[in-house]
C-alpha cells in the first residue's frame, strides 16, 4: 500500500466546534481545492466533546487528490495561563514591571502536563520552565517554588 502524495500543509488555529467556511478556513482550504464543507463537518465532529470556543492549533495535510487529514494539537499555553490567572489578555507593555496577574508554580506544572505532547521535551521540569517563560512574557508573575 503506497502513501498518498502530499500537496502541502495548512496550519490554522480554529475554535473548538467553530469551523465555518468563513475566513480564515475557507480561503486557506479553497486555494488547495479541498472540500471546505467536508473539513468543517469533520473538524466540528472531532471537537464535539470539547468546551466550545477553545482555540485549537490544527495541522491540515492536503494530498494531491485534494483529500485531506488533520491533526488537532493541544490549546496554546497562553490560553491555559489566561484561564488560570483569570485574565482576558496578557500585558501589552514590553517591560517586566507590567504584571497583569499571577499564576502558581503548581499551575505551570499542570499546564506543562497538558502541553507535554506538543512540547519539544519529555522532561516535566523542562516543560514547566517553558510554561513559566511563556507566563513571564505575558506579564504574569509566577509565585511559589
Swiss-Prot record:
SUPFAM superfamilies: Ribosomal L11/L12e N-terminal domain, Ribosomal protein L11, C-terminal domain. GO terms for cellular component: cytosolic large ribosomal subunit. The keyword Nucleus does not apply. It holds the Pfam family Ribosomal_L11. It comes from the Bacteria. Keywords: Methylation, Ribonucleoprotein, Ribosomal protein, RNA-binding, rRNA-binding. The keyword rRNA-binding applies. One or more lysine residues are methylated. GO terms for biological process: translation. GO terms for molecular function: large ribosomal subunit rRNA binding; structural constituent of ribosome. Belongs to the universal ribosomal protein uL11 family. Forms part of the ribosomal stalk which helps the ribosome interact with GTP-bound translation factors. Part of the ribosomal stalk of the 50S ribosomal subunit. Interacts with L10 and the large rRNA to form the base of the stalk. L10 forms an elongated spine to which L12 dimers bind in a sequential fashion forming a multimeric L10(L12)X complex. This is Large ribosomal subunit protein uL11. The lineage of its organism: Bacteria, Pseudomonadati, Pseudomonadota, Alphaproteobacteria, Rickettsiales. The gene is rplK.
